[in-house]
């Protein structure tokens, strides 16, 4: 007896997630849809470092020290690792409210604010929350249908609410939030060191070659070095400046979004409730604090009803490996109406007839 097993396609949650993100590797990689500038970042880093390792490092390792290419390789690998970690991870996206949850929140808001007359603007949907004796406003997101947590904001590019939203960075192709900010900071810090390192040793390389064949002749023989110097020179100021700005933000335990909006500028005696008043403590919390898990559950499996079929019940899940028999009664409830009438009582059985006596005549 042969048994035919029918396997249905599993639908994972990342396939149905709203927002403007792209997923790769079965939901393990999450990025924004606009990735053109991210590819430019990869091209500039890989191209510049390839030229540096191919030409300058070989000459400098012989003339000066073999440790020069070793340190360059360490900075390059660390920069690439932190870049990919920032670009491919969940920045802290907050799931949107389910239809039932959104309806409940709407009812709660209407009960609190009352009916708004037609033609009048409804009052702002805000909840007050106290953190370290400071009132923080929780704003309602009309797209995600939720009250955003403190420091969260909605990214207009990715169309998602992100926890501790810092900014959307097209150079890494992703939002920068609570779950990938530390990797973003380490990326720009290591990239600054790598840019300074490559730029400095390119100058040393040109100086050493110029002592032997002259400056102009060196420029003619090494066009790749000239290209590296130009790339490093123009990117050095922006990368180093960005690193300094984010170092300032880390020391204050503040985000780029809060700095642009002036949330904690000290006006009206409003101070940053998240700052510990100590640079070391702020740096430890931002860069070394516990990393929260992703709440998206991108690789989770959707129930069958949400992916186009009916979800299995608990009893079906426990007996899915057993041979399938007739459908249970509850599965037929949609086709046959439930009989709610009282069944008629069965009449009691009649007592058996007594045995008849046999007379002498019948014998």
From Swiss-Prot:
Catalytic activity: L-cysteinyl-[protein] + hexadecanoyl-CoA = S-hexadecanoyl-L-cysteinyl-[protein] + CoA
Chief place where the protein resides: endoplasmic reticulum
Region annotation (Disordered) ranges: 303-363
Membrane topology listed for this record: Multi-pass membrane protein
PROSITE patterns per the UniProt record, alphabetical: DHHC
Broadest EC class assigned to this enzyme: transferase
Residue spans crossing the bilayer: 36-56, 64-84, 184-204, 229-249
Coiled-coil region list: none
Listed InterPro entries: Palmitoyltrfase_DHHC (IPR001594), PFA4/ZDH16/20/ERF2-like (IPR039859)
UniProt EC number: 2.3.1.225
Residues annotated as the enzyme's active site: 169 (s-palmitoyl cysteine intermediate)
Spans within the Cytoplasmic topological domain: 1-35, 85-183, 250-363
Subcellular location per the Swiss-Prot or TrEMBL entry: Endoplasmic reticulum membrane; Golgi apparatus membrane
BP term (GO), one: positive regulation of pyroptotic inflammatory response
Residue ranges, compositional bias (Pro residues): 345-355
Lumenal side: 57-63, 205-228
Domain called DHHC: residue spans: 139-189
Function: Palmitoyltransferase that catalyzes the addition of palmitate onto various protein substrates, such as ADRB2, GSDMD, HRAS, NRAS and CGAS. The ZDHHC9-GOLGA7 complex is a palmitoyltransferase specific for HRAS and NRAS. May have a palmitoyltransferase activity toward the beta-2 adrenergic receptor/ADRB2 and therefore regulate G protein-coupled receptor signaling. Acts as a regulator of innate immunity by catalyzing palmitoylation of CGAS, thereby promoting CGAS homodimerization and cyclic GMP-AMP synthase activity.
SUBUNIT field: Interacts with GOLGA7.
Protein name per the record: Palmitoyltransferase ZDHHC9
Organism (species): Bos taurus
């Amino acid at each position: 007896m042969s048994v035919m097993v029918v396997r249905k396609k599993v639908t994972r949650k990342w396939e149905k997630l709203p927002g403007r993100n792209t997923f790769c590797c079965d939901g393990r990689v999450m990025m924004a849809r606009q990735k053109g500038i991210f590819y430019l970042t990869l091209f500039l880093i890989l191209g510049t470092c390839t030229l540096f390792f191919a030409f300058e490092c070989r000459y400098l390792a012989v003339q000066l020290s073999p440790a020069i290419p070793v340190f360059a390789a360490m900075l390059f690998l660390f920069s690439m690792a932190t870049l990919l970690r920032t670009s491919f991870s969940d920045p802290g996206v907050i799931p949107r409210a389910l239809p039932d949850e959104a309806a409940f929140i709407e009812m709660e808001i209407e009960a609190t604010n009352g009916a708004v007359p037609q033609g009048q603007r409804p009052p702002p949907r805000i909840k007050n929350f106290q953190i370290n004796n400071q009132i923080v406003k929780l704003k309602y997101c009309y797209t995600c249908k939720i009250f955003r947590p403190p420091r969260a904001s909605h990214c207009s590019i990715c169309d998602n609410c992100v926890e501790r939203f810092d900014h959307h960075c097209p150079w890494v192709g992703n939002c920068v939030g609570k779950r990938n900010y530390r990797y973003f900071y380490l990326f720009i810090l290591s990239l600054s060191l790598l840019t300074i390192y490559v730029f400095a040793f390119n100058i040393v390389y040109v100086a050493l070659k110029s002592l032997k064949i002259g400056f102009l002749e060196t420029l003619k023989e090494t066009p790749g070095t000239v290209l590296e110097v130009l790339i490093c020179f123009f990117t050095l100021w922006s990368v180093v400046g960005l690193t300094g700005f984010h170092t300032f933000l880390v020391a204050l335990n503040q985000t780029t979004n809060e700095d642009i909006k002036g949330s904690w500028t000290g006006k009206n005696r409003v101070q940053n409730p998240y700052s510990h008043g100590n640079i070391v403590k702020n740096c430890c919390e931002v860069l070394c604090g516990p990393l929260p898990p992703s709440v998206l559950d991108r690789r989770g499996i959707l129930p069958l009803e949400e992916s186009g079929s009916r979800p299995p019940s608990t009893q079906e899940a426990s007996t899915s490996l057993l041979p399938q028999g007739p459908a249970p009664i509850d599965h037929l409830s949609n086709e046959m109406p439930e009989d709610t009438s009282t069944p008629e009582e069965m009449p009691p059985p009649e007592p058996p007839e007594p045995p008849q006596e046999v007379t002498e005549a019948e014998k």
